[in-house]
């Protein structure tokens, strides 16, 4: 099964990993307070101590030229199956939105916080998508909150924006 490995750190440190591993498809982005690098592969990763996710639904290809929103969705063992079933069965008509590039639904290897990556041409295109019924009905905090479990036992639903690095 294809996996997505993610690590956070300084731009320089992560960029050096990328330079030292030209045979691996490593994607590096800038976040608000850090840099992030990820590798999507069926094989072994070069990243040390990454967060590990199994890719359970994918559309399109990753590119370092796109804007991404990573949505972290907390769940519990009691709700994870239902959450996963709901997200797998979502009609992927969101691919028709202007600027849409890619989508990944990820199951955590450890824990119960799922992750979704939405790739768009830029943040403006993503913000337009966030105003849609497709987003509000299937991916918003309100739409997914009943899969979170009891409060205090989980991390929060949140978004992290990943920007292309302009060199």
Curated annotation (Swiss-Prot):
Modifications after synthesis and translation: Each of the three conserved histidine residues contributes to TRAP phosphorylation. Phosphorylation is essential for TRAP activity.
Protein induction: Constitutively expressed.
Name of the protein in question: Signal transduction protein TRAP
Cellular compartment(s): Membrane
One biological process term in Gene Ontology: heme catabolic process
Originating organism: Staphylococcus aureus (strain NCTC 8325 / PS 47)
Keywords: Membrane, Phosphoprotein, Virulence
Record family assignment: Belongs to the TRAP family.
Domain ABM: from-to ranges: 67-158
GO CC field: membrane
An MF annotation (GO) of this entry: heme oxygenase (decyclizing) activity
